[in-house]
Amino acid sequence: MAKMTVLQYPDERLRKVAQKIEKVDDNIRSVIDDMFETMYEEQGVGLAATQVDVHRRLFVSDCSEDQNEPLVFINPEITEAEGHFKNDEGCLSFPGVYAKVERAERITVTALDKNGERFSRSAEGLLAICIQHEIDHLDGKLFVDYLSPLKRERIRKKLEKEQRLAEKQAAEAQ
């Protein structure tokens, strides 16, 4: 397994729409393993393939406190959604940024698992938020798209400033 690089906003590759996976094979399973390693190391609860520059319809998730409930969703589709609530969301592609986003309270998702077997799962709470957030990534949509243009611009400027500062510090350290 190998840790992957998580793309950071405003990288335009985060806007690419992911392509359907036609066959679940060893290459896809290897990507899944690497994505789990990356997600756990970055202390996330979900990671879409597009966030690691793999533009396929796949995401991994583990919303458990002990990181012992790994879930794989290949070609996911939300088939039911009900209720609405706002909750703070963060994202590995937006380090240190959190914002209130409105999502469906309860959902049902259909997808393929790591073995290519179709399954359906209902979710609420953090898992429902995570599934909706990661599917948005696969569609080229980011959680900041739910915010006002002013808030989006402030976040973009903040992250660009932090990136410049990190690059300057790295150059000075050499």
Curated annotation (Swiss-Prot):
Keywords: Hydrolase, Iron, Metal-binding, Protein biosynthesis. Its cofactor is Fe(2+). GO terms for molecular function: metal ion binding; peptide deformylase activity. CDD domains: Pep_deformylase (cd00487). Fe cation binds at residues 91, 133, 137. It catalyses: N-terminal N-formyl-L-methionyl-[peptide] + H2O = N-terminal L-methionyl-[peptide] + formate. The active site is at 134. Binds 1 Fe(2+) ion. It is an enzyme of class 3 (hydrolase). GO terms for biological process: co-translational protein modification; translation. Its EC number is 3.5.1.88. The keyword Metal-binding applies. It comes from the Bacteria. Removes the formyl group from the N-terminal Met of newly synthesized proteins. Requires at least a dipeptide for an efficient rate of reaction. N-terminal L-methionine is a prerequisite for activity but the enzyme has broad specificity at other positions. Belongs to the polypeptide deformylase family. HAMAP family: Pep_deformylase. This is Peptide deformylase. The lineage of its organism: Bacteria, Pseudomonadati, Pseudomonadota, Gammaproteobacteria, Alteromonadales. The gene is def.
